Amino acid sequence: MAEKRDYYEVLEVTKESTVEEIKKAYRKKAIQYHPDKNPGDKEAEEKFKEAAEAYDVLSNPDKRARYDQFGHAGMSGAAGNGGPFGGFSGGMSMDDIFSMFGDIFGGHSGGGFGGGFGGFGGFGGGGSQQRKFRGSDLRVKVKLNLKEISTGVEKKFKLKKYVPCSHCHGTGAEGNSGSETCPTCKGSGSVIRNQQTILGTMQTRTTCPTCNGEGKIIKDKCKVCGGEGIEYGEEVVTVKIPAGVAEGMQLSMGGKGNAGKHNGIPGDLLILVEEEPHPELIRDENDLVYNLLLSFPTAAIGGAVEIPTIDGKVKVKIEAGTQPGKVLRLRGKGLPSVNGYGTGDLLVNVSVYVPETLSKEEKSTLEKLEESKNFKPSTSIKEKIFKKFRSLFD
């Protein structure tokens, strides 16, 4: 499958573009690739859906912030791979797109741009504003340890949610009674109201109060769901968490939220990532940090020590004369980037342990060593340490 394009590139806007500029850019793309203008052109249809997906993210402040920070992985859980978070366009019909972006298409419901598109009309008539109900989003939390974050992991969730009614299959109607065209709006989902003003008669189009914008009414309502088309149930969902996710990151799994009334558009499942603290390692973005406490003899004469990593312990050589504050870098032993670009390092911060109590023999030995010039810091060492200390205040 082709890799997803950058959403800003799709709409030909920049990260500094305002919501209004993004809306204008999307409107331009929607007109260019609209199915009515490009009948039978599959490539144009895909570009139309691609533009709609980009607009869905960039026009929403929360989604846009996640996308700016994490890229496609923040929206799809597996950057551009069409996985379980494959974005809304993969499972959305053209009618769904028109329904979600009614303010752009002037209430289109599948039969051309319609008269409500203002100065962008002319691709068919209708002015229909039939509405599809969208289910609400569901939110869950997932707690991950560093090992799971480093490799990616699948998690199963047992969700209590609204699902299509098992009796009426989501229609809301009892048996085969079905639905009837709304007598108020004649199926358009909207009504035009005339209002007298000092400038003359003003016409406004509003949602039909009888059918609530659906364009149809149910005479014989389902006995199980009461005509809503949904009931409370359960669903087990498997979520593939990508490697490199971070605390506070929110993933979105399209279409796995609450079902929409009357076979409407389902909401999304939003997964908030929480990170379990590691007993020895601290995370710093994609790097991991470990505080190594060396004994004085090992720091002085050198040796080998074991360092914990995500994949187990590794032996690291300690050079003779290793100073406190030195940082050893184990490349590639950190966490992968959630966007798939590179892996962090494991930074080993060296500290030297000074014993609090000594035996007589140990104290005597150290007193003898104290007289040695090698145990007295030279002027150059003092200057080096002072420069490092002063840099903390620059």
Swiss-Prot record:
<dbReference type="GO" id="GO:0042026">
    <property type="term" value="P:protein refolding"/>
</dbReference>
<feature type="domain" description="J">
    <location>
        <begin position="6"/>
        <end position="71"/>
    </location>
</feature>
<feature type="repeat" description="CXXCXGXG motif">
    <location>
        <begin position="165"/>
        <end position="172"/>
    </location>
</feature>
<comment type="subunit">
    <text>Homodimer.</text>
</comment>
<keyword id="KW-0479">Metal-binding</keyword>
<feature type="repeat" description="CXXCXGXG motif">
    <location>
        <begin position="222"/>
        <end position="229"/>
    </location>
</feature>
<feature type="zinc finger region" description="CR-type">
    <location>
        <begin position="152"/>
        <end position="234"/>
    </location>
</feature>
<feature type="binding site">
    <location>
        <position position="182"/>
    </location>
    <ligand>
        <name>Zn(2+) 2</name>
    </ligand>
</feature>
<keyword id="KW-0862">Zinc</keyword>
<feature type="binding site">
    <location>
        <position position="211"/>
    </location>
    <ligand>
        <name>Zn(2+) 2</name>
    </ligand>
</feature>
<dbReference type="InterPro" id="IPR036410">
    <property type="entry name" value="HSP_DnaJ_Cys-rich_dom_sf"/>
</dbReference>
<dbReference type="InterPro" id="IPR012724">
    <property type="entry name" value="DnaJ"/>
</dbReference>
<keyword id="KW-0346">Stress response</keyword>
<keyword id="KW-0235">DNA replication</keyword>
<keyword id="KW-0863">Zinc-finger</keyword>
<dbReference type="InterPro" id="IPR036869">
    <property type="entry name" value="J_dom_sf"/>
</dbReference>
<keyword id="KW-0677">Repeat</keyword>
<feature type="binding site">
    <location>
        <position position="168"/>
    </location>
    <ligand>
        <name>Zn(2+) 1</name>
    </ligand>
</feature>
<feature type="binding site">
    <location>
        <position position="225"/>
    </location>
    <ligand>
        <name>Zn(2+) 1</name>
    </ligand>
</feature>
<dbReference type="GO" id="GO:0005737">
    <property type="term" value="C:cytoplasm"/>
</dbReference>
<dbReference type="InterPro" id="IPR018253">
    <property type="entry name" value="DnaJ_domain_CS"/>
</dbReference>
<feature type="binding site">
    <location>
        <position position="208"/>
    </location>
    <ligand>
        <name>Zn(2+) 2</name>
    </ligand>
</feature>
<dbReference type="Pfam" id="PF01556">
    <property type="entry name" value="DnaJ_C"/>
</dbReference>
<dbReference type="GO" id="GO:0005524">
    <property type="term" value="F:ATP binding"/>
</dbReference>
<dbReference type="InterPro" id="IPR001305">
    <property type="entry name" value="HSP_DnaJ_Cys-rich_dom"/>
</dbReference>
<protein>
    <recommendedName>
        <fullName>Chaperone protein DnaJ</fullName>
    </recommendedName>
</protein>
<dbReference type="GO" id="GO:0009408">
    <property type="term" value="P:response to heat"/>
</dbReference>
<feature type="binding site">
    <location>
        <position position="165"/>
    </location>
    <ligand>
        <name>Zn(2+) 1</name>
    </ligand>
</feature>
<feature type="binding site">
    <location>
        <position position="185"/>
    </location>
    <ligand>
        <name>Zn(2+) 2</name>
    </ligand>
</feature>
<feature type="repeat" description="CXXCXGXG motif">
    <location>
        <begin position="208"/>
        <end position="215"/>
    </location>
</feature>
<feature type="repeat" description="CXXCXGXG motif">
    <location>
        <begin position="182"/>
        <end position="189"/>
    </location>
</feature>
<dbReference type="GO" id="GO:0006260">
    <property type="term" value="P:DNA replication"/>
</dbReference>
<keyword id="KW-0143">Chaperone</keyword>
<comment type="similarity">
    <text>Belongs to the DnaJ family.</text>
</comment>
<dbReference type="InterPro" id="IPR002939">
    <property type="entry name" value="DnaJ_C"/>
</dbReference>
<dbReference type="GO" id="GO:0051085">
    <property type="term" value="P:chaperone cofactor-dependent protein refolding"/>
</dbReference>
<dbReference type="GO" id="GO:0008270">
    <property type="term" value="F:zinc ion binding"/>
</dbReference>
<dbReference type="InterPro" id="IPR008971">
    <property type="entry name" value="HSP40/DnaJ_pept-bd"/>
</dbReference>
<dbReference type="Pfam" id="PF00226">
    <property type="entry name" value="DnaJ"/>
</dbReference>
<keyword id="KW-0963">Cytoplasm</keyword>
<feature type="binding site">
    <location>
        <position position="222"/>
    </location>
    <ligand>
        <name>Zn(2+) 1</name>
    </ligand>
</feature>
<comment type="function">
    <text>Participates actively in the response to hyperosmotic and heat shock by preventing the aggregation of stress-denatured proteins and by disaggregating proteins, also in an autonomous, DnaK-independent fashion. Unfolded proteins bind initially to DnaJ; upon interaction with the DnaJ-bound protein, DnaK hydrolyzes its bound ATP, resulting in the formation of a stable complex. GrpE releases ADP from DnaK; ATP binding to DnaK triggers the release of the substrate protein, thus completing the reaction cycle.</text>
</comment>
